[in-house]
Structures are given as C-alpha cells and as structure tokens.
Amino acid sequence: MAEEGPPEPSIDFVPALCFVPRGVAKDRPDKIVLTQAELARIIGDTQQELDEESDDDAEEGENAEEDQNDMDVDDHADANSENRDPQDEFQFQEYDNEANANVTSLANIVDAGEQIPDEDEDSEAEDEVIKPSDNLILVGHVQDDAASMEVWVFNQEEEALYTHHDFLLPSFPLCIEWMNHDAGSEKAGNMCAIGCMDPIITVWDLDIQDAIEPTFKLGSKGSRKQNKEQYGHKDAVLDLSWNTNFEHILASGSVDQTVILWDMDEGQPHTTITAFGKQIQSLEFHPQEAQSILTGCADGYVRLFDCRDAEGVNSSSIEWKVDGEVEKVLWHPTQTDYFIVGTNDGTLHYADKRSPGQLLWSVKAHNEEISGVCFNNQKPNLLTSTSTEGTLKVWNFDGTEAKHVYEHEFNMGRLQCMRQCPEDPYTLAFGGEKPPRCAIFNIKNSIAVRRTFGIPDAE
C-alpha cells in the first residue's frame, strides 16, 4: 500500500497581488537581526492584542446573551445575517476565529532561528540580488488558516519568475497597494499597504526582508480593558488607493460602509466618508485631480467625491447607478474624464465624469463577477477584463461601444485579481485558486490583439 502524503490544503488561492515598479527596490534587501528583548516585545505585544480581543469578545458575548432575551428568534437570525461578511465565500469567519494559532507559529519560526541570517550564507547568490530591470510582484497567498505575502521577482527580458522571500500576515489579505511614501522620511521608500479581513491596515517596508511585524498600522480596534480608543475601520478592508499627487494620503474602503482618507504621516484618519448604503468594494483617486476619489459600492452606486472640504464631503458626490453590485472602478490613465465600472453580474459600463448619471455604453462581458479591469496607456482604446469564471478578455472600445477581440482561459479556477506591469501595459499578472495560482501573461502573444491594435509582430 502506497504511503499517503500530507493532505492537500482545503483552501489555497491568491486573492490579491500588486506590481512594484522597476528600479525602486534595494538590490539586497536589509535583513534584520532581532535581539532577545525585541523578540520578547513583539511576541508580548501580539499576545496582548489577542488577549484584549478575547476579553472584548467575551464581554460583547455576555452583552449579546443578555440582549437575546429581548429578541425574537427571527430578529436574531436577521442580525446574524447582516453581520455575516458578504465576501466570506470561503468561510473565513472560521479562519479569523483561529487567530491564536498565529502566535504559536510566530514563536516557532523565531525559535528555530530561521529569521536570523547566517554569516556564512552566500549573499552573492544571483537570485538574492534584485536587478534594476526586475519587477517585484507582491502576491497575497492564503493556504488553509495561514496567510502570507510572497515577494516574487519578475524579469521580462530574461523570462524569469521566482519567489524571493515571504512573510506572514496577521489576517487573510484582500487588497495590496504599493507606494513610495515612507512616513517620517524625506526619501522615497518602497512600501506596501495591505487590507485584510481584519480592520487594521498594515504598512510594510519592502526593503526589509525578514520583517515579522509591519512598519506601522492604520487603525486600532480599541480595548475597554486597556482604555484604548477605537479608530479607523470596524470591519474588513476591501480596497486601497494611494494618492500619487498627495503622497501622504491613502484611501481605504471597508465592509463597515465607510471610506477613510488616512494621513500616513500622522497615522490618523483625515477624512471619513459615510455616504454609502453597503460595503465599498472598489475605489481610486483621480490620476490628476488629487481631491477627487471614485468609489464603487455594493448598493449599485458609483460615486465621485470632492474631498477638499472634509466637513461637507458626504454631500459633495455625483452618482451613477448600475444594476447589481459594483466590483471594480478604474480611471482611464490618459483620457482622464472617463472611467470603467465592473459589476457582480459580469457587466462593464463606461462613463464620463462630466455627465452624472449617464452611461456611455454597457456590455455583458462575462457570465460571473468582474474581478479585474485594466486600461492600456499605450493604446487608449484597449481594455482588458477578468472574471471569476476564469477568463481574460480583450476589448476594443470607443465612446459608443466595446467590441470583443480576444479571450484566454487560464484553467486556474476562479480568477480573483488582475494587475498590470507598470512598464509594459501588455503584461498582466493574475491570481487564482488552482495551480499555478499566480500567472503572468502578455496579450501581445495574440495575433488578434496585434492586428486589431496595430502592434508590430515580435522580431
């Protein structure tokens, strides 16, 4: 009888990924050697946070038990339904309830000494060196109850793709945003913000290879026991957008039905937008107008806010209504009055910010929800879309219609995300739920794409 190997993970997929531009990463990321005191502090802080959450959860449970006596059974069921995470297709409520396991994992890793670099290691190994021609790809990976960020190296010229290093995350990642703003430093950084099932946004320095805690966090759950005030989001963070014009500002959208504009230099919310009927699933700052942010909500509304007046921002929006839930919104990078909207029924809508409430065209692009959209800054009439049905499609569009050009089936199960290489808009990265789970694809490989958009054949 053949020996049985380890069981296959029941959950294994890539829910989020992000490109890092070439030339911004250190050629050799710093490796941190922790002292025993620093190690004890990190483990102690983590354990304290979990103890505080456990105490608060217990107190909330006692209060809920008292309140239950005053409720109808039907009302109680409705409340549970409302509190259930709408993104929880893989039952990650159970994953969050197992948070205590992460502390044990953290302690074991540190005790094993695997985070401490050996002086005898060959630091000149080629794969360790990040070249100016390399892109990094930040890959959020979920495997059963473990969540991690994998930092991949992608070199287009050499056709190389490999994992450089990874680090543990405190919760299941939902969105990743790269930014070069290093809070507290006058120099440009190499940072990323991660939104998770947990309401706290973590910000990591990508030039530090062995980090076991983020550089800083945005938000606090608060603690009655420690008399700590709650601030920031109260539920999962579904999307992030960095303001490239005001580089200290990061926007986040949440299941708690708010958008927060964070001042990263202060580590505090600057503006909170509450004009939503359901969770915010997508948002993006305008590429040129720093005060404008576009949001997509599960209530079927796309809203454009002027954020210059923090007090009046909730009444400043203009709106577009579509059928279904808004899954994606994206500004056109060169024709910046226009934007695309993707919904949970697989429809794409194109609109002009100067025409509130009007849609220029709509097309039933996919049979399932839109999980990614990308414009092309070299070909302004080229649009790509992906869906959880597992396909990539390429569209040729103008102000009146979109025509299907090409499609590709990845056989990776449900495609969860798609992002575009900053230096080559034809090269796209995808995250899915079946091997290889992360894939790179260049749409110029398609003859139909080259012919339609006048792209020369490769030599």
From Swiss-Prot:
One of its GO terms (cellular component) is nucleoplasm. Chromatin-associated factor that regulates transcription. Regulates Pol I-mediated rRNA biogenesis and, probably, Pol III-mediated transcription. Regulates the localization to the nucleolus of Cdk7, a regulator of the Pol I-elongation factor TFIIH. Acts as a regulator of cell proliferation and tissue growth as part of the TORC1 and Myc signaling pathway in response to nutrients. Required in males for both germline stem cell (GSC) maintenance and early stages of germ cell differentiation of germ cell cysts. Changing residue 252 to A: Reduces expression levels; does not affect phosphorylation. Residues 48-73 have a biased composition (Acidic residues). Belongs to the WD repeat PWP1 family. Detected in the germline of adult testis and ovary (at protein level). Detected in ovary somatic cells, in zfh1-positive cyst cells in the testis and absent in differentiated cyst cells (at protein level). Residues 44-84 are annotated as: Disordered. Phosphorylated in response to nutrient-activated TORC1 signaling. Induction: Increased expression upon activation of the Insulin/TOR/Myc pathway in response to protein diet. Gene3D superfamilies: YVTN repeat-like/Quinoprotein amine dehydrogenase. Interacts with Mybbp1A. This is Periodic tryptophan protein 1 homolog. The modification Phosphoserine is found at residue 385. Residues 74-84 have a biased composition (Basic and acidic residues). InterPro entries: PWP1, WD40/YVTN_repeat-like_dom_sf, WD40_repeat_CS, WD40_repeat_dom_sf, WD40_rpt.
